[in-house]
Amino acid sequence: MKRLLKGFSHTDAYEWFENEGVRLTTQEDECVFPVSQDAMEIVNTLTQIINRLGIRLLTGHRVELISHDKENGKYSLRFGGNRSSATADCVVVAIGGTPAASQLNMFSPLDIITENPVPSLFSMCLPGDGIKKLMGTVVEEATTSIPGTKFKADGPLLITHWGMSGPAILKLSSHAARFLHEHEYKTDICINWCGGRKAEEVTEELSAISASNTKKQLASAYPPHLNARLWQHLIERSQVNPQLRWGELQRKGLNKLVNTLTADIRRVDGKCRFKEEFVTCGGVSLKNVNHSTLESKDHDGLYFAGEVLDVDAVTGGFNLQAAWTMGHTVAVAIEKKYKN
């Protein structure tokens, strides 16, 4: 993607949409959304442009099979139902992510290599975990990881009535999509409630709180990035008496608090859909395509763009940017190929 982004970057996309009348805003985590917070504004804008350019849009035409006659170079598209088939000199496949491998069967006559699609953007279920009572609580800077792996993510973490969500969880689900699928969404996750800070740093912070609040109970004085309810929960999880005064806290109790704050192990058992799981990893393998033009290596005039390819990213416009960049790449390649 880095090479392709040089041809049509996030800046280009930003300017393009604003020139078409869509006002955008960039959040602190660099995610871009319409100021209206209405995704349909993007859809409506694209639809208006299609109509303005006189592009024919066939709805209700589900493609069942794509075949290629290499002798005359023509492609044949077979539609579902009683609809007649269509022929084309060039085909661009931009069907988005597919939650089921069977939806990639349209490529079967072409011997296209595909990777099994699996969800890659979802929140996590923590059945039986008492933290769910704190639903609605947000920790702005948290780090999540899966013990024994290199999968790691950071960002805001949201406690929900089913478990956990927010960027720190959604990013982790994206990075570890195949791992989680293979383990049937049952795994331990490790949470650092202090934004990735090391145990030594958190020990210093709690020691400073202790020194300034010797007569206060543990539940009454706590790190400023946590709220009182979550702090109470974490104290109890550390098996430390919340009514203990800071001046009475021994080293052993301090270490327990630090360990919970920096390495809180929770059990995940299941996933919850995030906006109907509109992101998947898997799809058409990148081994099939020329990485500069996104044209098939084996079928002249066949292109792929967007999430139908085995690419995915986190929420906030990154998947859309990848799709628009690839769309631009394919358009330029087709113009160059067929301009004569």
Task: Place the predicted regions along the sequence by residue.
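A conserved short coil-to-beta-strand element within the FAD-binding core of flavoproteins
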Residues: 59-75
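Conserved N-terminal/central alpha/beta ligand/cofactor-binding core
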Residues: 1-56
